[in-house]
């Protein structure tokens, strides 16, 4: 029997209906909601006269060609010599060849903005525009830089002028978005809503962001405030990772004095940013009314007994997986857990040997004893049957039986995903000074189907699942080798190895795992990510019609405008659900400052400078400059945490800072795809499988340089 509780992720629950009706399911209904908000607010906007067709939505006119001189210089940016790259470009700003000088000034404008040199950025982009006044991308960039500098009227005029240079969707849509933001930041919410309405009805790639902005505008205007939740629901239905939409929704339900929902949404935010004192205070304040039942309002799976019961084991390489790890991959100190076995089980102490046996489906409890710093093994009546300060093992006597770990208690209900989990193999209990940790020692082949289960929402085709199984098997083998001397090889919250229990597996996953065992990757860093555009970390893929993309700071911004090609392998089935491929978020600078302050107080944010890139421009390092200091990191995951509390989809993005005076007030992030862009793209694999490619062909496509071993014959390709 399963007990489902409220999700601790960005999905709005049915109880929100008391605040607003469920978000509309089609663009037609969505548009009527926009019109209603516009009318309620006396806004003068009209729906776009014509709907965009598929050809227009997937056509790209963007040209990534660079003059040879500039192409050579920007390679210094990739190598991490961002300052040398900047000053080398300056040698070409007055080059007699207009093609070279305009390109140099364009790159310098973008790099200057990243360095917080706003007035210089304006000067450079105006110089680029004067050198090449017919280039629509230069004109568009000019509008965005003026907007960043707070020159709202000039920005709107520039965006309007762009429409005389081009009618191409990629440029026009970005210009309309810039115009809407210029109206909003200048305080004219009616005009902003009207401009956002145009984008809302014409650009399916921006629905989530525009819905959020319409919700934000509605929340700030009394006549339409009651409609704000509808737009926020729509925003989250199109992109569940839109952190600002959740933050705004939390404030709205708080104003409505709905303590339960306020706790739920603040708990969602706090689970992502657990060092945030303001969020901690909100969670504590509204949690008081829920008492000990607060955990029941989180999305934790509860199982009364094992679901699988029996599953034949496949002897293979053993993997030690630490359970209940947090986002930093640290296994949490547990205080109490219950468990049962689907067959007779035994407890073995590392020194005493076998100390206890217990029958199937009998609940037992492991509880930390703060006096002894050990753990007590108790029966259903609370009587201690065994105590230990040393690690001990729990294992079903028959290898095809399973163990269920349930009702987990940790120091904080937000410390990790505390869902119940059914396991294969052995459960190792490790007492510590402050609790105990759990490690699952399991065969790799028994683990792989459960790892596949966490990805079935992304991929459903058998060939794609088989390809992912190959990647997982190879990655597990690498992890075992690399961490052979450690107490565990992986955690259950690793980005590559999300584990929610064997209770989620089904026949197709077992078959995919078995079939895929015929080959294995060697000498490659096997990995995967959920969804993809055409520019991966160091390759151009996922389409038959590959763009001539080359890296430069300007080309990254240009690519963020680009339409996905019609034949994109990762193309979603629902034409309104593009957020996993293209996304836009707007973050308050004060939130970014507060997360940096966990490590170092740099004061108010002055500049956000990418410092290291992958060959194609994914951000691998970033410098944050403030009024009191500078903080720098070369960890993409930390970058995404600082900017978005870890809710951003990938490290492939550009940034438009919006200044108020000399410091940044808001940060607009425009991004593509998910993850780090390395290895197997799950949605891309699904697309290739639909074209008839088998799992071997998919593996060869995404790992063209890998050595593939045939596990049956031992031959290597």
Say what each PLM segment does.
Residues 1-4:
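Positively charged n-region of N-terminal signal peptides that target proteins for export
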Residues 7-15:
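Bacterial N-terminal signal peptides
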Residues 20-90, 98-100, 107, 112-114, ...:
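Conserved, single-site charged/polar hotspot
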């Amino acid at each position: 029997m399963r007990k489902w509780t409220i999700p601790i992720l960005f999905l709005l629950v049915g109880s929100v209906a008391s605040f607003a009706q469920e978000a509309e399911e089609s663009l037609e209904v969505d548009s009527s909601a926009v019109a209603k908000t516009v009318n309620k607010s006396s806004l003068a906007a009209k729906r776009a006269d014509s709907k965009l067709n598929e050809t227009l939505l997937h056509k790209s006119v963007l040209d990534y060609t660079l003059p040879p001189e500039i192409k050579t210089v920007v390679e210094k940016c990739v190598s991490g010599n961002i300052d040398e790259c900047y000053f080398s470009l300056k040698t070409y700003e007055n080059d007699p060849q207009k093609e070279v000088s305009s390109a140099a000034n364009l790159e310098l404008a973008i790099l200057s903005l990243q360095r917080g040199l706003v007035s210089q950025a304006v000067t450079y982009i105006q110089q680029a525009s004067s050198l090449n006044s017919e280039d629509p991308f230069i004109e568009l960039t000019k509008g965005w830089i003026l907007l960043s500098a707070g020159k709202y009227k000039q920005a709107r005029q520039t965006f309007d002028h762009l429409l005389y240079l081009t009618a191409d969707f990629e440029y026009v849509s970005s210009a309309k978005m810039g115009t809407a933001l210029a109206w909003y930041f200048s305080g004219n919410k009616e005009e902003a809503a009207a401009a956002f309405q145009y984008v809302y009805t014409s650009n399916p790639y921006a629905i989530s962001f525009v819905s959020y902005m319409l919700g934000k505008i509605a929340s700030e205007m009394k006549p339409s405030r009651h409609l704000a939740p509808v737009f926020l629901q729509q925003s989250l239905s199109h992109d569940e990772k839109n952190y600002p939409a959740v933050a705004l929704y939390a404030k709205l339900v708080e104003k409505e004095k709905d303590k339960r929902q306020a706790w739920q949404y603040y708990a969602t935010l706090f689970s992502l940013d657990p060092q945030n004192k303001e969020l901690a205070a909100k969670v504590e304040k509204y949690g008081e009314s829920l008492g000990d039942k607060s955990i029941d309002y989180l999305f934790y799976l509860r199982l009364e007994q094992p679901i699988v019961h029996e599953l034949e084991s496949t002897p293979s390489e053993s993997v030690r997986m630490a359970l209940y790890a947090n986002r930093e991959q640290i296994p949490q100190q547990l205080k109490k857990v219950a468990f049962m076995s689907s067959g007779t089980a035994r407890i073995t102490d590392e020194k005493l040997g076998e100390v206890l046996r217990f029958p199937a489906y009998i609940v037992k409890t492991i509880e930390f004893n703060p006096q002894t710093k050990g753990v007590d093994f108790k029966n259903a009546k609370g009587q201690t049957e065994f105590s230990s300060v040393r690690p001990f093992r729990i294992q079903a006597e028959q290898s095809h039986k399973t163990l269920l770990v349930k009702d987990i208690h940790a120091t904080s209900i937000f410390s990790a995903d505390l869902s119940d989990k059914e396991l294969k193999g052995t459960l190792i209990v490790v007492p510590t000074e402050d609790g105990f940790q759990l490690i699952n020692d399991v065969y790799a082949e028994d683990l792989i189907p459960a790892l596949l289960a966490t990805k079935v929402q992304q991929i459903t085709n058998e060939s794609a699942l088989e390809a992912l199984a190959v990647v997982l098997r190879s990655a597990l083998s690498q992890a075992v080798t690399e961490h052979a001397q450690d107490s565990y090889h992986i955690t259950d919250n690793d980005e590559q190895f999300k584990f929610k229990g064997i209770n989620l597996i089904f026949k197709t996953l077992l078959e995919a795992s078995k079939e895929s065992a015929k080959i294995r990757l060697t000498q490659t860093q096997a990995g995967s990510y959920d969804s993809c555009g055409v520019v991966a970390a160091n390759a151009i893929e996922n389409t038959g019609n590959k763009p001539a993309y080359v890296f430069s700071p300007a080309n990254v911004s240009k690519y963020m405008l680009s339409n996905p090609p019609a034949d994109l392998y990762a193309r979603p089935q629902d034409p309104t659900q593009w957020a996993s491929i293209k996304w836009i978020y707007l973050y308050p600078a004060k939130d970014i400052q507060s997360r940096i302050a966990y490590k170092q107080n740099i004061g108010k944010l002055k500049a956000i400078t990418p410092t290291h890139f992958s060959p194609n421009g994914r951000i691998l390092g970033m410098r944050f400059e403030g009024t009191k200091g500078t903080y720098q990191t070369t960890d993409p995951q930390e970058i995404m945490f600082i900017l978005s509390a870890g809710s951003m989809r990938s490290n492939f993005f550009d940034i438009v800072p919006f200044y108020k005076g000399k410091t940044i007030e808001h940060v607009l992030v425009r991004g593509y795809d998910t993850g780090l862009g390395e290895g197997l793209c799950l949605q891309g694999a699904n697309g290739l499988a639909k074209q008839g490619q088998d799992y071997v062909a998919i593996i060869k496509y995404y790992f063209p340089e890998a050595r593939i071993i045939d596990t049956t014959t031992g031959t290597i390709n």
